[in-house]
Amino acid sequence: MIPQLGQFKCKDLRCPSCGSGVRRYEEKETDVAVAAKLLELVVTGACDTAMIVSGETDLIPAIRTARRLRPDKKLCVAFPHGRANDAFRGEVHVCFKIRATQYARFQLPDPVVLPDGQTITKPASW
C-alpha cells in the first residue's frame, strides 16, 4: 500500500460586510497526485492491481488512461462511507462502498511510518 497524502493550503477570508475574518484550509493537488501515482504504478508494472479509495470523478481520466496503456492491470475503486459515485461503473474492474463499521476493523497501525521516515499518528477521535 502506498498512501498518497494531500496538501492543504491556508486561506484567510474576510466578510465584505463586517470585515470579520476566518481561516479556511483548501485541499490542493491530491487528485492530481493520486492520478500521477496510479499511472506510475500501472505503467511501470509495479502493481498487478491498483485500489483507489476515493469517490472523486476527477480520477476517471487517469483510470481510463491506465486501462488503455495497461489493460492487463486490474483497477478497483473503494468508495469512502457516503461517497459512492455511479460514474465509476464500467471504468474499473471492481467498485464497492466501504461501510462505516469497516473503518474500525481495518485501520492502519498507529503510528504509520512512511518510506521517507515521516510518522503519521492517528487522531485520538478515531
List where the protein language model places each region:
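Active-site histidine-anchored catalytic micro-motif
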Residues: 29, 41-90
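A charged nuclease-like catalytic/ligand-binding cleft shared by nucleic-acid processing domains
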Residues: 1-49, 87-126
